[in-house]
Curated annotation (Swiss-Prot):
Designated gene of the protein: ciaR
Protein name in UniProt: Transcriptional regulatory protein CiaR
Any one biological process term the GO annotation gives: regulation of DNA-templated transcription
Listed transmembrane segments: none
Disulfide bridge partners, by residue number: none
């Protein structure tokens, strides 16, 4: 499932956005700029929804520090600041989109989907890799029309690999994304689940193209 970081100090609006996106994304809510910056740096997210008028540290400062640290996660600013100067400043700092309040939740979702499509993280309801078809709506996997049962984190792991082809994925990044950096389990669980997915997809293009990078992580080559 898509992971979104929502940095918004208005509790009512934050909860409304959270509820509206609940069937589409896993949304992490934080309510001030310092906490937002910490989460954006330590977690793994597909998109950041960022208010500007935040306590502790304003949204412009958060965005500036993220980009200076090389964090390229798409950022959609949503704010009551509607002047052309504010919009220009946001884009100069590295924002990917800018939505002024008040807004329709439906429009917010459309903009989110557009940004995710642009970054390759969202492709309607299916992902295809060689002879594998993954349905994101039903959480099902088929290999040449034959169902293959991948449960829970197995399914999430496959989707994460397919969404990050030709990208070196450190074990720590996979662990933070799927289990959370504050999880009580150990990082060795990543190897366990990679082994499970490989076994269930034995003989597929995925199993052939998934490389283990010793002491680093994994790399899934794209389909040639």
């Amino acid at each position: 499932m898509i992971k979104i970081l929502l940095v918004e100090d208005d509790l009512g609006l934050s909860n409304s956005v959270f509820d509206f996106l609940d069937d589409f994304a896993d949304v992490m809510q934080v309510f001030d700029g310092e906490e937002g910056l910490y989460e954006a740096e330590s977690g793994v997210y597909d998109l950041i929804l960022l208010d500007l008028m935040l306590p502790e540290k304003n949204g412009f400062q958060v965005l500036k520090e993220l980009r200076e640290k090389g964090i390229t996660t798409p950022v959609l600013i949503m704010t009551a600041k509607e002047s052309l100067d504010d919009k220009g400043h946001g884009f100069e700092l590295g924002a990917d989109d800018y939505l002024t309040k008040p807004f329709y939740l439906e429009e917010l979702k459309m903009r989110i989907q557009a940004l995710l499509k642009r970054s390759g993280k969202f492709n309607e309801n299916t992902l295809t890799y060689g002879n594998i078809v993954v349905n994101l709506s039903t959480n099902t996997v088929k290999v040449e029309d034959t169902p293959v049962e991948l449960l829970g984190k197995e399914f999430d792991l496959l989707v994460y690999f397919l969404q990050n082809q030709n990208v070196i994925l450190p074990k720590t990044q996979i662990f933070d994304r799927l289990w959370g950096f504050d999880s009580d389990t150990t990082i060795s669980v990543v190897e366990v689940y990679v082994s499970k997915v490989r076994k269930k997809l034995k003989g597929t293009t995925f199993a052939e193209n998934l490389q283990t990078l010793r002491s680093v992580g994994y790399l899934l080559k794209d389909v040639q």
